[in-house]
Amino acid sequence: MSTGRPRPPIPDTYAKALGDDDPVEAMAEAPDRLRRLVRGLTDRQLSTKPAPGKWSIKEIIAHLADGEVILGSRYRFIAAHDRPAIQGYDQDAFAAKLGPLNAKAADLIDDFAMVRAANLGLLERLPEEAWERVGLHSERGEESIRKLVYMYAGHDRHHVAQIETIRTGLFPKAGRRTVKAATAARKPKRPARRRPR
């Protein structure tokens, strides 16, 4: 069983966002961080794009929820099949065509939290050797379950920081305390999950 971070390493942006934090704990706390970040914002604020071609807060949350659905299928294919092909997807098409601006932010976060909980449950019950199994991503090549866990934990943190930037940049009076509380490191309230090795 390998220890430490996955090889090859995850993208720098995500590695920096995660730092030395436990990726499973980071993934477990992400839905609550999102809930705190959107508290006090109106639907109009949540739907406001910070610039042309950039996603709104709701679109970012929908992206996290959509990504979690796809991630769950990747975990399952990799765990159950030998070196399965893992297809990339067009995240901008998802944002444009799946109607995130027509949803309530709280519902999008609930969707994300539900799928995330199911995926964390799967990770907890997988045998340890499954974490080293790989799939062949159409754009990035070999990816193990371990690498996906680290990458998506950093991906969450990256987008939480993006939401914080949008919130404080566009809506500075919406409550700085909420933003500060949302981005502060917290331990999940549930029992700790098995740590990646």
Segments (PLM) and residue ranges:
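Short, intrinsically disordered, low-complexity terminal/loop segments
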Residues: R194-R197
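A glycine-rich, hydrophobic loop/mini-helix early in the fold
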Residues: E29-W55
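Acidic/histidine-rich alpha-helical segments that form the ligand environment
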Residues: E25-L37, A93-E132, Y152
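Short coil/turn segments at secondary-structure junctions
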Residues: Y14-G19, A96-A106, E143, K147
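Short, contiguous alpha-helical
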Residues: M1-T13, S47-D92, L120-G121, E128, ...
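Short, charged, low-complexity loops and linkers
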Residues: P9-E25
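Amphipathic, non-membrane alpha-helical segments in soluble helical-bundle scaffolds
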Residues: D20-P31, K54-I61, A105-I109, R146-V149
